[in-house]
């Protein structure tokens, strides 16, 4: 990941499962929405794993490895759906040498032993406790990642700002205004956490 353009704050977006390019595909619409709403202030990086139709943790781990190796300044982290859970797993287990200024998790599933490849270790959040701001977003009637997943993350991140959203959105094709507002509310030169 190249150094961000002068004056722009860097955002790394970890995508959902499935195809990622084109309207209605995975995280694509949400990323395009964020780029349109945050342009001029933020630079959004949207790396995609190899063959996203067949996601594995190893593919995400490889992608995060090269993406984080290129980060030289504080970064805002966003994880959407599977991208959120793999981002948490990577951050807590690999502990990359980055400065995270905030963590945003959208429609993030909590994998149990039936999907142990993506399962988080017990007390994973202990390795992330110094991230200055954690935000959680989940639709009350999400059919892809049921609402009870949010309860798990609320318990793990006790000081998180939680946005319980009406409806059943999971991919947020029409955008997520609350996310834009929260990103813009971050302090300009706020604290960051080195993992």
List each language-model region with its residue ranges.
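Short, surface-exposed "cap/lid" segments of acyl-processing enzymes
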Residues: 2-53
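Conserved alpha/beta-hydrolase "acid-adjacent" motif
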Residues: 143-149
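Catalytic histidine neighborhood in serine/cysteine hydrolases
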Residues: 43, 154-171
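Short beta-strand/loop motif that positions the catalytic acidic residue
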Residues: 130, 135-138, 142
